[in-house]
């Protein structure tokens, strides 16, 4: 979730001229709603659970997809009832890089730096929700690093 917050802020900062600085992450209502709230995975998951039963939903983390693209794509294809052949979806067994930073008119934005206070505040907000999400999707609570 912390890396997702960084990525989302960089994406938004590269497109939105008046995007607040990263140190305003929890002070800016716009950043808090758009970036931090979007990182409350269990809360987001539950919004879909109101409409769809658990067996009709599949959760794959970015880490799983990046580390094991073939296995993850086969799992996705099988889940949707498609033939689990992902050979045409990958480039030399890896996910294709199609949306490089700076493409589509976005500025190249450097990775932000967390102050210790900001990082701890963000962790205090998102970690309990993240752990509920991990438990509800059958993953260990130490799936994500918080350092």
Description of each model-found segment:
Residues 2, 26, 73-74, 134:
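Generic structural signal for individual residues within well-ordered alpha-helical segments
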Residues 43:
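Active-site glycine-rich loop that binds ribose-phosphate moieties when present
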Residues 1-40, 89-115:
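Lumenal/extracellular "mature" regions of secretory-pathway glycan-modifying transferases
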Residues 36, 46-131, 139-147:
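The conserved 3'-phosphoadenosine-5'-phosphosulfate
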């Amino acid at each position: 979730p912390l890396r997702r917050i960084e990525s989302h802020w960089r994406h938004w900062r590269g497109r939105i001229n008046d995007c607040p600085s990263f140190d305003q992450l929890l002070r800016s209502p716009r950043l808090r709603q758009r970036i931090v709230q979007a990182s409350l995975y269990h809360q987001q998951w539950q919004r879909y659970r109101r409409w769809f039963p658990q067996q009709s939903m599949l959760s794959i983390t970015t880490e799983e997809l990046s580390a094991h693209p073939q296995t993850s794509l086969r799992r996705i294809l099988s889940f949707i009832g498609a033939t689990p052949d992902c050979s045409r979806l990958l480039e030399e067994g890896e996910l294709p890089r199609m949306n490089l930073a700076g493409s589509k008119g976005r500025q190249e934005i450097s990775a932000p730096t967390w102050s210790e206070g900001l990082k701890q505040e963000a962790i205090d907000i998102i970690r309990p929700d993240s752990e509920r999400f991990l438990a509800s999707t059958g993953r260990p609570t130490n799936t994500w690093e918080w350092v």
